[in-house]
From Swiss-Prot:
This is Mitochondrial Rho GTPase 1. Residues 409-419 have a biased composition (Basic residues). PROSITE patterns: EF_HAND_1, EF_HAND_2, MIRO. It comes from Emericella nidulans (strain FGSC A4 / ATCC 38163 / CBS 112.46 / NRRL 194 / M139) (Aspergillus nidulans). PANTHER family: EF-HAND CALCIUM-BINDING DOMAIN-CONTAINING PROTEIN 7.
């Protein structure tokens, strides 16, 4: 909110500056002699004062040379300048002296041009003055926001002149309209195009009558009458007859309507629309709207809330114009039209190849939701930013922010404690020797075909998909191959333990030198022991070979007291999907993927001993019975 607006009244001597101020304060023309420079006055808000103005300070100035330093100081302190002229000479001085002088001071404030003493120019009509005097100046000097004819003697348009000054600050024309080109500026057009897109709820390219009425309520908080609706359509049809159809008003007509508002001095209407959609004076979205406060505690994570998932589901369904169950390039481009484009992290992650696609290569609904689940997990601020760009509206009155689309999971500090973690999105890092099959594992995760060509992974690669757990519950599993960043990621202990839910160790069971990479890696980064782990022997369709390592894989995992030996699997087998379930379960129930404690091992040996004892006893009893039966038969 603007706590105090300063209006600096400038102009040649004798143009009636002080009389205008006095007439504003008194409400009538003062015939008595007025002092050369009035002291500054502060006026409270009145009816018609913009809502975000609390008080207005009006400063009188003198044009005499000895007051030039005071004049410059007041101009620099002002929010708007009311430049007054009253005859041909003072009018000529507007372009020759005053406006160049303002520019020389380096000020960037709007100027309201005021033709005072209109009672003395009865032979000039309003239209003549505007066309002959004001419009040429406005086309030459962009800083002129608006113009008005006044008469302090007749108290004509005095209040309106100062009201225009207030409006020039709260609803400036300069960011919206180029008077010289007689066109809306590109930034204004872009903002209005986004507003049209968000108001077109069914994405058919037209604002229907209902959508226009909903738009009216959102922006102006009052209903639109049928007569006003008809008038709007007729106004557009006069210059753009093709923009009004039975389906509604198209974007071209909507932009033209706002251009007309700006041309006719009704740019306040345009600003009301822009601010209803969270735009600032610089035509950027408000920072607090794009980046609301949202904290994720250590060992917790961010996920989409049910309302967030609903929003992205509806957005997908609206954007899938051909109803083929996938978003093609054109549909994605249309969907992201009100945004700066794809999130940078998506481009870096080779979207859409990192998520689920159909046979045509188009992102499916499953892949779309998985991608946003991953984005929210890794960068909740990105999701919040794009929720704002895409027009998310919270249904929660207690939380109207975009943060209503997200939720924070409970921190998981003690992963070795039995039980599930309270999250639906988990992250697993895949590590292993070069050529062990990590990339093929990611391809299989996304149901991609197996390729026999080996391409070493340089840049990190990520894949995300849903996994159905035993019992029918689903979770989103993010898996990434670290590439050249593996050392940097693994040595950052704090970040690794905070973000990673499971570490997946892979080796090529047909390569004798593959497994040795894993013990060496764990020795180099001992904090990996604090993460749940899954060991996978890939390429099981090939001949298994003895590993050149201190311990064979099954011996190594046994020495660690892991719950079981490495999983043997091939990405060419249909059973590969069970591996992803196993990985997801290890992340969701981390206690099952840690080395067993001595108590667990002793308990297992005891249960084996009891079972073995029972078998021995049963066998001995059977022998005794057989002997007795045999003896009785002799």
């Amino acid at each position: 909110m603007l706590c105090c607006m300063r209006i600096c009244v400038c102009g040649d001597e004798g143009t009636g500056k002080s009389s205008l101020i006095t007439s504003l304060v008194k409400g009538v023309f003062v015939t008595n002699k007025i002092q050369p420079i009035l002291p500054q006055i502060t006026i409270p808000p009145t009816i018609g004062t913009p809502e975000n103005v609390t008080t207005t300070t009006v400063v009188d100035t003198s044009a005499v040379p000895q007051e030039r330093s005071n004049l410059a100081r007041e101009i620099r302190k002002s929010n708007v300048i009311l430049l007054v002229y009253s005859d041909h000479y003072s009018y000529e001085r507007v372009a020759l002296f005053w406006l160049p002088y303002f520019r020389s001071l380096g000020v960037n404030v709007p100027v309201v041009l005021c033709a005072n003493k209109s009672d003395l120019a009865a032979d000039h009509t309003e239209t003549q003055v505007i066309e002959d005097e004001m419009l040429p100046l406005m086309s030459e000097f962009k800083e002129i926001d608006s113009c008005i004819r006044t008469s302090a003697r007749e108290h004509r348009n005095v209040n309106e002149a100062f009201f225009l000054c207030q409006k020039a600050v709260t609803h400036p024309i300069a960011p919206l309209f180029d008077a010289k080109e007689s066109a809306l500026k590109p930034a204004a057009v872009a903002a209005l195009q986004r507003i049209f897109y968000l108001s077109d709820k069914d994405r058919d390219g037209y604002l229907s009558d209902k959508e226009i009425k909903d738009f009216q309520m959102r922006c102006f908080e009052k209903p639109l009458s049928e007569e006003d609706l008809v008038h709007i359509k007729e106004t557009i049809q006069k210059t753009h007859p093709d923009s009004v159809t039975p389906s509604g008003i198209d974007c071209r007509g909507f932009i033209h309507l706002n251009k007309m508002y700006a041309e006719k001095g009704r740019h306040e209407t345009v600003w009301i629309i822009l601010r209803a959609f969270q735009y600032t004076d610089s035509l950027s979205l408000q920072e607090s709207y794009l980046h609301p406060k949202f904290e994720v505690p250590p060992f917790a994570s961010a996920e989409l809330s049910p309302e967030g998932y609903r929003f992205f589901v509806n957005l997908f369904l609206l954007s899938d114009k051909d109803n083929d169950g996938g978003l093609n390039d054109a549909e994605l481009a249309s969907l992201f039209a009100p945004t700066p484009g794809l999130p940078p992290s998506w481009a870096d992650g080779s979207f859409p190849s990192c998520t689920v696609r159909n046979e045509a290569g188009h992102v499916t609904l499953q892949g779309w939701l998985a991608q946003w689940s991953m984005t929210t997990f890794t960068s909740p601020k990105t999701t919040l930013e794009y929720l704002a760009y895409l027009g998310f509206e919270s249904s929660d009155r207690s939380n109207p922010s975009t943060t209503a689309a997200l939720k924070v999971t409970r921190p998981r500090k003690r992963r070795k404690r039995p039980g599930r973690v309270g999250r639906n999105v988990v992250l697993g890092h895949i590590v292993g020797a070069p050529g062990s099959g990590k990339s093929a594992l990611l391809d299989a995760f996304l149901s991609r075909g197996f390729s026999t060509t080996y391409h070493p992974t340089i840049q990190p690669r990520t894949a995300v998909n849903t996994v159905e757990l035993p019992g029918g519950k689903q979770c989103y599993l993010i898996m990434d191959e670290l590439g050249e960043l593996e050392p940097a990621i693994l040595e950052n202990q704090a970040k690794l333990l905070d973000q990673c839910d499971v570490i997946v160790y892979t080796y090529d069971s047909s390569d004798p030198d593959s497994f040795a990479y894993i013990p060496a890696l764990r020795a180099k980064y001992p904090h990996l022991e604090e993460l749940p782990s899954v060991y996978i022997a890939l390429k099981a369709d090939l001949d298994r070979t003895t590993q050149r390592a201190e311990h064979q894989p099954h011996e190594y995992t046994a020495l660690l007291n892991m719950p079981g030996p490495p999983l043997h699997v091939s990405v060419t087998w249909s059973s590969i999907q069970e591996v992803f379930v196993h990985i997801a379960e290890a992340a969701m129930e981390p206690s099952t993927a840690f080395p067993r404690s001595e108590e667990d091992v002793e308990g297992k040996w005891m249960s084996w001993g009891i079972a073995l004892g029972a078998v021995v006893c049963a066998g001995a009893a059977a022998v005794m019975i057989w002997r007795r039966v045999s003896g009785s038969g002799v």
